[in-house]
UniProtKB/Swiss-Prot annotation:
Its main location: cytoplasm. It comes from Streptococcus pyogenes serotype M1. GO terms for biological process: tryptophanyl-tRNA aminoacylation. CDD domains: TrpRS_core (cd00806). This is Tryptophan--tRNA ligase. One of its GO terms (molecular function) is ATP binding.
């Protein structure tokens, strides 16, 4: 029986943080280890260039860092094909054909793109590559005939745009060579988008409000001890608020089942008064370190031989290119432009 295909990836614009870990990485490793799927995981460097065109050095440096993060959390190149987007030229050619099937107005209506354009402050100077990146994503997904694409809830419009392109292509060229994907969305809404340590709605590289998978133990400790809690909880005996308190928010996400009774007791104690922020932060630190310590150890080990890390990426890219080339050939045959 053929295994369903999963495609997922990240933009290499810096090291990955806890938001990436709970939002996608942890689930990828789970899906990989279930051994029920064929996994493709990629570093979307071309997409990163759509809004970092003048920062190619950052992207180049981030390729190695993100690859280390992948390996350290448990993604295994023997079980998952890990590749670099720019090393698969077939993706750019597929994008070109798909762009002929999507109007500019449709791209401008994409809610995810509209939100991101506003956040990035492009104004009237929107890079054309950024505006059409949903088409590039469709090429990424369809090149590997992905059945399932794990994404955050904010990416639902991107999946729907890909599905539209697939339907349009298959209808226009009387074929079924492209597969219509389904999105896999986070069950835990809190984990789907981890807030920053400062209480900001999202943990973000640009805001510097995150804990990175590569942070050493001392850095993690300092960051946890500086976390946003309840600004009105000045004295230990003061009643404290749970809502909006990042320490308790993180505890809800990272705690295991066996921790739940302790956490509920801490919440009650905190709200009544008599429990200080230092104690709750130390408790959270222990829980985070339980998760981060083995990741950190593996990362340090892999970092000793970056040549091997890049050999893994090269092999994965070669493997991925073979698959993408087959899809491209089918697409061109359907269009009647496979001349030779």
């Amino acid at each position: 029986m053929t295994k369903p295909i999963i495609l997922t990836g990240d933009r290499p614009t810096g090291k990955l943080h806890l938001g990436h870990y709970v939002g996608s990485l942890k689930n990828r490793v789970f899906l990989q280890n279930e051994n029920k799927y064929k996994m493709f995981v990629f570093l979307a460097d071309q997409q990163a260039l759509t809004d970092h065109a003048k920062e190619s050095e950052l992207i180049q440096e981030s390729i190695g860092n993100v690859a280390l993060d992948y390996l350290s959390v448990g993604l295994d190149p023997k079980q998952s094909t890990i590749f670099i987007q720019s090393q698969i030229p077939e993706l750019a050619e597929l994008s070109m054909y798909y762009m002929n099937l999507v109007s500019l107005a449709r791209l401008e209506r994409n809610p995810t793109v509209k939100t991101e354009i506003a956040q990035k402050g492009f104004g009237e100077s929107i890079p054309s590559g950024f505006l059409v990146y949903p088409v590039s994503q469709a090429a990424d997904i369809t090149a590997f005939k992905a059945n399932l694409v794990p994404v955050g809830n904010d990416q639902k419009p991107m999946i729907e745009q890909t599905r539209e392109i697939v339907r349009s292509f298959n209808h226009t060229y009387h074929t079924d060579c492209l597969v219509e994907p389904e999105g896999i969305y986070p069950e835990n809404e809190k984990a789907g988008r981890l807030p920053g340590l400062d209480g900001n709605a999202k943990m973000s590289k640009s805001l510097g409000n995150g804990i990175y998978l590569s942070d050493d133990a001392d850095t993690v400790r300092k960051k946890v001890m500086s976390m946003y809690t309840d600004p009105n909880h000045i004295k230990i005996e003061d009643p404290g608020q749970i809502e909006g308190n990042m320490v308790f928010h993180y505890l809800d996400i990272f705690a295991r089942k066996e921790d739940q009774a302790d956490i509920e007791a801490m919440k009650e104690h905190y709200q009544i008064g008599g429990l200080g922020d230092v104690k709750t932060k130390r408790y959270l630190l222990d829980i985070l370190e339980r998760e981060l310590a083995p990741i950190r150890e593996r990362r340090l080990e892999y970092a000793k031989d970056m040549g091997e890390v890049f050999r893994m990426l090269q092999e994965g890219s070669q493997k991925a290119r073979t698959v993408a080339a087959k899809t491209l050939s089918e697409v061109k045959s359907a269009m009647g432009i496979n001349y030779f």
